């Protein structure tokens, strides 16, 4: 087993979710298809609720910002032609959601609606979040060693809490000290990691970021964050240069904390 020694100055471990703590297959084969298959029914059931209308307003604002993109799908204004017909408006929102998801967009508006849909599904017991078997034991060990553990994902903070609160391992939210999403910045921008360090109240070199995405790893590294790239089944392959440049682990159990001995 490869062992990666965690630098002594590290006091915070920052975790990505998809492809790092959780199989990509769970996200791609269960979470995302659930949204596509149920978004119209969800909107019809919750259309009159303020939370749903807030989601729609955010999606409409995003659609306006996207109007210059090829193939962009508009969401009409709340007043005007067809606005009095909820089904017509719902279809416009559904079409926009499908379009964004087909491009694997990570917009805050899309993530917020997805998070609300997943909340309903998790609370109804329709699904449980999957974690790799090495994750929970390792995180418990890190916390016992005095480490802080945070999560940074493109999924909304609410969606993150749903995953950790409704997992196949039970409710493991207590293992996480805090959550960050794209509201603090995108994961491929180095400034986001500086903001996270400021929010936590530490230096960037006190953080070890675990992710499966090399572009995120590069951005974090540029900010002065320590990085390890997690190689899991189903993850995108790495180039030879990336394999040489980054520290690689295939399991959280491969991290060695000098402070835990």
Swiss-Prot record:
Signal peptide: none annotated. Its cofactor is Mg(2+). Keywords: Amino-acid biosynthesis, Cytoplasm, Hydrolase, Magnesium, Metal-binding, Methionine biosynthesis, Nucleus. SUPFAM superfamilies: HAD-like. It catalyses: 5-methylsulfanyl-2,3-dioxopentyl phosphate + H2O = 1,2-dihydroxy-5-(methylsulfanyl)pent-1-en-3-one + phosphate. GO terms for cellular component: cytoplasm; nucleus. Its EC number is 3.1.3.77. Pfam families: Hydrolase. HAMAP family: Salvage_MtnC (MF_01681), Salvage_MtnC_euk (MF_03117). Belongs to the HAD-like hydrolase superfamily. MasA/MtnC family. This is Enolase-phosphatase E1.
């Amino acid at each position: 087993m490869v062992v990666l020694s965690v630098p002594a100055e590290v006091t915070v471990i920052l975790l990505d979710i998809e492809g790092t703590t959780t199989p990509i297959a769970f996200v791609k084969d269960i979470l995302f298809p659930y949204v596509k298959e149920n978004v119209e029914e969800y909107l019809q059931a919750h259309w009159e609720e303020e939370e749903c209308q807030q989601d729609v307003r955010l999606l409409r604002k995003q659609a306006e910002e996207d109007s210059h993109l090829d193939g962009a799908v508009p969401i009409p204004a709340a007043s005007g032609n067809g606005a009095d017909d909820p089904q017509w408006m719902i279809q416009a929102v559904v079409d926009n959601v499908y379009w964004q998801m087909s491009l694997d967009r990570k917009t805050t508006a899309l993530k917020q609606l997805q998070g609300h849909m997943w909340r309903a599904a998790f609370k109804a017991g329709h699904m449980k979040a999957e974690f790799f078997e090495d994750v929970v034991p390792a995180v418990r060990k890190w916390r016992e060693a005095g480490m802080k553990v945070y999560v940074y994902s493109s999924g909304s903070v609410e969606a993150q809490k749903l995953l950790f609160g409704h997992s196949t391992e039970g409710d493991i939210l207590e293992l996480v000290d805090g959550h960050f999403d794209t509201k603090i910045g995108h994961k491929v921008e180095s400034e986001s990691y500086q903001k996270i360090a400021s929010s936590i109240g530490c230096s960037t070199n006190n953080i070890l970021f675990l992710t499966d995405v090399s572009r995120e790893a590069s951005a974090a590294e540029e900010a002065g964050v320590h990085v390890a790239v997690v190689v899991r089944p189903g993850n995108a392959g790495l180039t030879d240069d990336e394999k040489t440049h980054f520290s690689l682990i295939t399991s959280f159990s491969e991290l060695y904390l000098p402070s835990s001995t």
